Amino acid sequence: MLTSKHEFSLFLNTPAINSKSEKEVISEGPLTTSNEIDVTFSESFSSHLINLRRVPSVNSIIEQEKKGLTKISPSILNQNIAYKEKRQQLFSVLYEETVGYVSMDTLCIAISLLDRCFTVKPTIPTTSFKIYAIGCLFIAFKLTSDYSVAKKSFCENLAPSLSTKNLEKYEKIVLALLNFDIYVISLPSVESFLTPLIFQHVFFKSLPSESCDQMMVEWQYLLVEVMKDCQFIEYRPTEILCASFWVLLEIIWPSAFDFKPFQHLCSLPTNGSADETYIKHSNRFHDLIISIQRIADMLA
């Protein structure tokens, strides 16, 4: 639950007090390396990823992601330094201080809606960040809940000084700005679909359960750091998931896995390997890997 001091630091330009959440404590520590693996496992896993790309649902997800990217402008958002700082601070505080109340899916949808708001209207003053942040978060709660979100409970848990009347006002401001176009396919929702498919491979079933658990913790920690950073908003969720998972495997088992099958899994439809779209995506995926590797290096 956010206390009043956290609310103040979020929305009124006061530096947040550093604290470590339970999630950070669990995930803290260097990404570890392991012994070499059999090349047969590597080749088999590569084939597994290539086959997953043929799953109709994967293609449907990628098409939805493409549409989502058309609703934001990475260049506009990354040029807005004040917005980038407040966005990262909002993500960090909600992630660290609202465990059990704000799900990761809700958080990511709220951030995506906020990105859309500041794309549609880049001139939103810094002093109005609170209005759009709260409005987007309340809408995200509604989108991810199977029940009506109680306005009073929302305010008590996330913005104690806010009245339910103003909460309704903030929600309407966001809805009007976005013309009620609020559908978001979030990274957590894609991850919940894609990860079980990836882990169906016999390679992961052959690992001790504690190794898989640790791998998931380290992957989550890496993903959280990526999602905080505004530089990654130009990438689709499947791209981030595939690139970050390859980076993690590369750290644990250096040079054991080819990155191309991971690239293929998140690739846009093309007419062949020489197609211009394929080449563009290859360069894009390579750049993404390098950026994520930098973050992994800082976490090590």
UniProtKB/Swiss-Prot annotation:
Cite the Cyclin N-terminal domain residue spans from the record: 61-183
* Gene3D superfamilies for the chain: Cyclin-like
Q: Name any Gene Ontology BP term.
A: signaling
Q: Which GO terms describe its molecular function?
A: cyclin-dependent protein serine/threonine kinase regulator activity
GO terms for CC?
Answer: cyclin-dependent protein kinase holoenzyme complex; cytoplasm; cytosol; meiotic spindle pole body; microtubule organizing center; nucleoplasm; nucleus
Q: What is its main location?
A: cytoplasm
Localization per record = Cytoplasm; Nucleus
What keywords were assigned to this record? Cell cycle, Cell division, Chromosome partition, Cyclin, Cytoplasm, Meiosis, Nucleus
State the protein's purpose. Has a role in meiotic chromosome segregation.
Q: Please give the family membership noted in the entry.
A: Belongs to the cyclin family. Cyclin AB subfamily.
What name does this protein carry? Meiosis-specific cyclin crs1
Task: Please report the organism this UniProt entry assigns to the protein.
Answer: Schizosaccharomyces pombe (strain 972 / ATCC 24843) (Fission yeast)
Q: Give the gene name.
A: crs1
